Amino acid sequence: MRTALTQLLQIEYPIIQGAMAWVSEHKLVAAVANAGATGVIALGGRDAEWTRNEIRACKELTDKPFGVNLMLMAPNKDELVDIIIEEKPAFVTLGAGNPVPYIKPFQDAGIKVIPVVPSLKLAKRIQDAGADAMIVEGMEAGGHIGSQTTMSLMENILPEISIPV
């Protein structure tokens, strides 16, 4: 199957396994990547050493692309940004904060940036800032405070956006 997302991430199927705290660790992520989709290591509540070890452990289990999810409200986000840039997963998903200042530093390190967006306004901002793709999440997604469902967000966002969703 060939889509904008499969081409961007060099994966076989246009499926991104979500970052679920305490569940999305290296074994799951590598298994998803090895099956032709891509996985995301959830960093919520984790420290820098754990983050580095998880990325390295995942690389030992797969040579396929995978990503990490960084919650921008994390008190140690700057340290985690440095670790992610050093370890170079294929992509990073960004949520729970303003992703715009982080897009260029990650891209300069060769890491694709895929922010999670809960609104058309943020979707336009991250596209204008150069994000590689975006994940649209509505109010039914865990931990999100938006007031629209994913379906209604998609109806508003897709006609306005040219990057992969």
Name each model-derived stretch.
Residues 1-164:
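Active-site entrance/lid segments in N-terminal catalytic domains of soluble metabolic enzymes
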